[in-house]
């Protein structure tokens, strides 16, 4: 008689780390309870990303996202999604030193049901990662193209194109792993070095614009579903023409109202 595996009620870091070299991790962003509930049974990880500042608030970059903003949207996502591992981005300026980082990370844990926090930076952030993990906070690292450094870098630039960058990326990954990071996001990294990092470190890598060899993939939901069309990165694959579908539905609704076809008798009270 075969034993059936009980369904997972809540995905943990242990579940994700067990997928290393076994099964790809599926991750997506979400910013509210409605979409989090839709994504809930279909993904392993939901990132409440500071990307919301661009896709949700229509800003040019992520830099003026605030801790309050991230807490608000994380609470909403946690209300909608019960199964996935939920990661909250630490916004720009919220982890500038250990005291500030601890204060804000602890707020995330106390005020939301987030599973982990994510911060950008390489080996220079290793000491901070260790401090946070020593206090019981699960930290997700983020190296490569780092949106919070976009003004310093002069734009969104792919990393790993030369030997010096490749060496630094590998050193960054190893340092963050040693410091206690539970997962590592690789963004905008050339495929060969993303593959090497994934094969070298023991913790799972989640890629965005970093080739297919990472342990998992993440996309911004509004990019993937075709709602955000003002700019489309090379690495984005659209699985739906969401904006077009919604606009067509609104046009049909408006047409029905103008022609007196909505509401009809079945949609009215007597």
Swiss-Prot record:
Single GO MF descriptor: 3-methyl-2-oxobutanoate hydroxymethyltransferase activity
Q: What class of enzyme is it?
A: transferase
Give the Gene3D superfamilies listed for this entry: Phosphoenolpyruvate-binding domains (3.20.20.60)
UniProt-annotated binding residues for Mg(2+): 50, 89, 120
* Predominant location category: cytoplasm
Positions in coiled-coil regions:
none
The UniProt entry's GO CC annotations, sorted and at most eight, read: cytoplasm
Cofactor requirement: Mg(2+)
* Superkingdom of origin: Bacteria
Q: Where is the active site?
A: 187
Q: A Pfam family matched by this chain, by name?
A: Pantoate_transf
User: Which sites bind 3-methyl-2-oxobutanoate?
Assistant: 50-51, 89, 118
Question: Could you tell me what reaction this enzyme catalyses?
Answer: 3-methyl-2-oxobutanoate + (6R)-5,10-methylene-5,6,7,8-tetrahydrofolate + H2O = 2-dehydropantoate + (6S)-5,6,7,8-tetrahydrofolate
Q: How is the cofactor bound?
A: Binds 1 Mg(2+) ion per subunit.
**Record keywords, A-Z:** Cytoplasm, Magnesium, Metal-binding, Pantothenate biosynthesis, Transferase
Give the pathway listed in the UniProt entry for this protein: Cofactor biosynthesis; (R)-pantothenate biosynthesis; (R)-pantoate from 3-methyl-2-oxobutanoate: step 1/2
One GO BP annotation of this record = pantothenate biosynthetic process
Q: Tell me which InterPro entries the record gives.
A: Pantoate_hydroxy_MeTrfase, Pyrv/PenolPyrv_kinase-like_dom, Pyrv_kinase-like_dom_sf
Q: Where in the cell is it found?
A: Cytoplasm
Q: What is its EC number?
A: 2.1.2.11
Protein task: Catalyzes the reversible reaction in which hydroxymethyl group from 5,10-methylenetetrahydrofolate is transferred onto alpha-ketoisovalerate to form ketopantoate.
Q: How does it assemble?
A: Homodecamer; pentamer of dimers.
Please state which protein family the record places this protein in.
Belongs to the PanB family.
- List the HAMAP family: PanB (MF_00156)
Indicate what this protein is called per its UniProt record.
3-methyl-2-oxobutanoate hydroxymethyltransferase
Source species of the chain: Helicobacter pylori (strain Shi470)
Task: Give the gene symbol.
Answer: panB
């Amino acid at each position: 008689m075969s034993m059936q595996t009980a369904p997972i009620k809540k995905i943990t870091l242990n579940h994700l780390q067990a997928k290393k070299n076994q099964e790809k991790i599926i991750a997506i962003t979400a910013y509210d309870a409605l979409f989090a509930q839709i994504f809930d049974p279909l993904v392993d990880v939901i990132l409440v990303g500071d990307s919301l500042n661009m896709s949700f608030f229509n800003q040019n970059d992520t830099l003026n996202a605030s801790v309050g903003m991230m807490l608000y949207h994380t609470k909403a996502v946690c209300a909608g999604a019960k199964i996935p591992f939920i990661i909250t981005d630490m916004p720009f300026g919220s982890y500038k030193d250990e005291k500030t980082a601890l204060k804000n990370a602890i707020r995330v844990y106390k005020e939301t049901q987030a599973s982990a926090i994510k911060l950008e930076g390489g080996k220079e952030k290793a000491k901070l990662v260790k401090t946070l993990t020593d206090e019981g906070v699960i930290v997700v690292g983020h190296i490569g193209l780092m949106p919070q450094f976009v003004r310093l870098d002069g734009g969104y630039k792919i990393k790993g194109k030369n030997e010096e960058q490749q060496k630094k990326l590998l050193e960054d990954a190893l340092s963050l792993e040693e410091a206690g990071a539970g997962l590592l996001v690789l963004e905008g990294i050339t495929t060969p070095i993303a593959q090497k990092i994934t094969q070298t470190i023991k913790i799972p890598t989640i890629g965005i614009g970093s080739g297919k060899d990472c342990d998992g993939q993440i996309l911004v939901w509004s990019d993937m579903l075709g709602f955000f069309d003002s700019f489309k990165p090379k690495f984005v694959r659209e699985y739906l023409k969401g904006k077009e579908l919604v606009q067509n539905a609104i046009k049909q609704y408006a047409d029905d109202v103008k022609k007196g076809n909505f509401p009809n008798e079945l949609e009215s009270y007597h």
